[in-house]
Amino acid sequence: MADGVSPAMESLDILNVLRLLPHRYPFLLVDRIVEIDGDNSAIGIKNVTVNEPHFMGHFPERPVMPGVLIIEAMAQTAGAICIQHAKQIKPSVVYFLTIENAKFRKPVVPGDRMEIHVKKVKQRGMIWKFACEAIVDGGKVAEAMISALLSAEEPE
């Protein structure tokens, strides 16, 4: 690779997301990954619809996507980076470890197309830390720092 040239960006449709992530309905919260740059960054898409089960109770008269699910969408997008990388080192699982500085700025509602931007900011061994943002219509709706552990062993 020539100096100053970054590797080609990848894009993953839903079928490839399903091959990559272990999550399934109703907990798969990434519909597409429009950009994944090696083990550095990714942009995921979550198309929010009123048909999702959490909207039956959160809240029936004014549906709002729960903040914890926005964080989970961030974790799944970051997890895609980890799992892409893990293919080379063969860990069996990626664990979500921490959430720091989570902020929710605006509700995410049915009909929104949420972009999830994640960027690896630190790596120490098998623990990776990511800066994450959720964006709707060009505006930041949530942000958090999260960390994950790539593990070669299943828990007991």
UniProtKB/Swiss-Prot annotation:
Main localization is cytoplasm
**Family annotation (InterPro entries):** FabA_FabZ, FabZ, HotDog_dom_sf
CC terms in the record's Gene Ontology section:
cytoplasm; membrane
Return the EC number: 4.2.1.59
Where's the active site on this chain?
H58
Give the UniProt family note: Belongs to the thioester dehydratase family. FabZ subfamily.
**Record's protein name:** 3-hydroxyacyl-[acyl-carrier-protein] dehydratase FabZ
